[in-house]
Amino acid sequence: MDFKRKLLIAALPLAFCVSGLAQAEVKIKFAEVHPAGYAPVVAEQNMGKKLEEQSKGEISFKMYAGGVLGSEKEVVEQVQSGAVQMTRVSLGIVGPVVPDVNVFNLPFVFRDQAHMRTIIDGEIGQEILDKITNSQFNMVALAWMDGGTRNLYTKKPVRQISDLKGMKIRVQGNPVFIETINDMGGNGIAMATGEIFSALQTGVIDGAENNPPTYYQHNHYQNAKFFTMTEHLILPEPIVMSKATWEKLKPEQQTLVKKLAREAQMEERALWDKSSADAETKLKAAGVEFITLTPEQKKAFYDATQPVRDKFGAPYKDLISRIEAVQTNPALAANNTQAAQ
């Protein structure tokens, strides 16, 4: 046997070994519509780093932030097909496919942010994740990100509910959100996040609704200087993985992904609270007026949206009662108070 043949035979086991490693590797593309530096994006990137390290290189992770892979709806379709492996998705998009999640989409269903966090950390939060996983959505729901408390921001001040009458307000394309704004007296306009800035600039809309970090990061304050603290929605948002990708993972890899997603859930809320406080400070410095409602003024928004809760919450009365009965975790309530200071 000549030297070259011996060398080839000797190299075969190594070649098979390398080939096996290449086949075992799972490559994860994580798509985000939000920009780099946004609290959920930071927590998701940290999750990815841990995933690469703790899987010993069997799983690779790359973040695509800032909507470079498309709008949220487009990204969801890519995750469903397996072209993108993971994302964080708004429940406004999930709701039409998995109706149960619309319970979390109902206006004023949570008393405050601490109450919402208590819910998603517990039994009800896991039940909703399971509903998403077991639906036709074609994704595995792993954990929750805090999507913040949504308020109105407008070109003209909204100091009481009557000021909203006739205003065109951008919302996500979910009937619950559209009817919420309509019942408040405005005109809910479904629109992708990336279209809001120009729509405000050109007068296509009079305002939108979201949390302070999103309002700041997307520069919407440049065209809408009034931020009214309605707190009408407090929305958690799930981290999801394509079912096709999930089924490629070994059981121990699935366990690792779930563990790290849960860790990201806890890390993100600390990042969120800081970014929310920082955003509010920067927005005020940029000339934004934050309008705080009296209890009576806020109740007017609550009462106006009762038909939405009655209509969309009717099939889930028992679940809503369970949510209302949950007592806020005292530690979360304390953290919430500190963040607000």
Which residues does each PLM region occupy?
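Bacterial N-terminal signal peptides
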Residues: 9-19
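Bacterial N-terminal signal peptides that target proteins for export
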Residues: 1-10
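N-terminal secretory/targeting leader peptides
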Residues: 12, 25-116, 123-124, 130-341
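Bacterial Sec-dependent signal peptides at the C-terminal "C-region" and cleavage site
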Residues: 21-23
